[in-house]
UniProtKB/Swiss-Prot annotation:
Protein localization: Cytoplasm
Pathway: Amino-acid biosynthesis; L-histidine biosynthesis; L-histidine from 5-phospho-alpha-D-ribose 1-diphosphate: step 1/9
Catalytic activity: 1-(5-phospho-beta-D-ribosyl)-ATP + diphosphate = 5-phospho-alpha-D-ribose 1-diphosphate + ATP
PANTHER family hit by this protein: ATP PHOSPHORIBOSYLTRANSFERASE, ATP PHOSPHORIBOSYLTRANSFERASE ATP-PRTASE
Entry EC no(s): 2.4.2.17
Keyword vocabulary terms for this entry: Amino-acid biosynthesis, ATP-binding, Cytoplasm, Glycosyltransferase, Histidine biosynthesis, Magnesium, Metal-binding, Nucleotide-binding, Transferase
Subunit: Equilibrium between an active dimeric form, an inactive hexameric form and higher aggregates. Interconversion between the various forms is largely reversible and is influenced by the natural substrates and inhibitors of the enzyme.
Inhibition and activation profile: Feedback inhibited by histidine.
Gene it is expressed from: hisG
Functional note: Catalyzes the condensation of ATP and 5-phosphoribose 1-diphosphate to form N'-(5'-phosphoribosyl)-ATP (PR-ATP). Has a crucial role in the pathway because the rate of histidine biosynthesis seems to be controlled primarily by regulation of HisG enzymatic activity.
Primary localization: cytoplasm
Name of this protein: ATP phosphoribosyltransferase
GO molecular function: ATP binding; ATP phosphoribosyltransferase activity; magnesium ion binding
Length: 299
């Protein structure tokens, strides 16, 4: 039996979100020994239990209050939400935040040699998908009648097998579609991983732990999106240089030994520093420009 005083987090056991979810928790300082076959893991340094389950089970576990938090793709979450509403349920949860991994898109795809002139050309077509409610919502909005062929895997083989005229499936690079003689024709939903919380009041200790975890997740994501920049800058060009480097706060300026005309500038930049920007900095008189990754960050 799980200790209900501990925070319970559901995450994908295996698949495209599993490794990124594990890495996120590790970078948040949560020490978990995840054995490949173990479905429940316990944090060594925090009162947190990890349930490793199928991704399409995670929304239900959160909505039904079995776990406190879940890391899940928005596509799976939205499909479960639409499914429950179609059954007359009123599913509840709280979206804590979108995460910076698991990006994909749910797209319509057709055989490479098939003509496509918009969604209305799919009128009365048979479409294979694992996301029937997301597909229905989109095509209903386009005024398109269609027949759904529900498949829970290998959706891309449906046209060749004569099961469907088109498919609606997740796409990351498009390589799988191409390998099966298909081409992406329309994106109907864009998705990333997200963190969700069950509905209802949390015990104070659990809520405090969730807030600590959210602060750490925010720091991890900010650190990944930011760079620490050090450079030497002419004292009379500081405002121009700072305009090229959007930062979290004003930079730290330090005097340079034996040089009254320049200063050392240290700052966190919240945007990617491209080569073009570095060339612009150099043109303004900056030198010794260093761009460093940030491991952890807390504002």
């Amino acid at each position: 039996m799980l200790d209900k005083t501990r925070l319970r987090i559901a995450m994908q056991k295996s698949g495209r979100l599993s490794e990124d979810s594990q890495a996120l928790l590790a970078r948040c300082g949560i020490k978990i020994n995840l054995h490949q076959q173990r479905l429940i893991a316990f944090a060594e340094n925090m009162p947190i239990d990890i349930l490793r389950v199928r991704d399409d089970d995670i929304p239900g576990l959160v909505m039904d209050g079995v776990v406190d938090l879940g890391i899940i793709g928005e596509n799976v979450l939205e499909e479960e939400l639409l499914t429950r509403r179609a059954q007359g349920d009123d599913p509840r949860y709280t979206l804590l935040r979108r995460l910076d991994f698991g990006a994909c898109r749910l797209s319509l795809a057709m055989p490479i040699d098939a003509a496509y002139d918009g969604a209305r050309g799919l009128q009365d077509c048979r479409i294979a998908t694992s996301y029937p409610h997301l597909l229905k919502r989109y095509l209903d909005g386009q005024g398109v009648r269609f027949k759904s062929c529900l498949l829970n895997g290998s959706v891309e083989v449906a046209p060749r097998a004569g099961l469907a005229d088109a498919i609606c499936d997740l796409v990351s690079t498009g390589a799988t579609l191409e390998a099966n003689g298909l081409r992406e024709v329309e994106v109907i939903y864009r998705s990333k991983a997200c963190l969700i919380q069950r509905d209802g009041e949390m015990p104070p200790a659990k809520q405090a732990l969730i807030e600590r975890l959210m602060t750490r997740i925010q720091g991890v994501i900010q650190a990944r999106e930011s760079k620490y920049i050090m450079l030497h800058a002419p004292s009379d060009r500081l405002e121009e240089i700072m305009a090229l480097l959007p930062g979290a706060e004003r930079p730290t300026l330090l005097p340079l030994a034996g040089d009254k005309r320049r200063v050392a500038m240290h700052m966190v930049s919240s945007e990617t520093l491209f080569w073009e920007t570095m060339e612009q900095l150099k043109a303004l008189g900056a030198s010794s420009i260093l761009v460093l990754p940030i491991e952890k960050m807390m504002e």
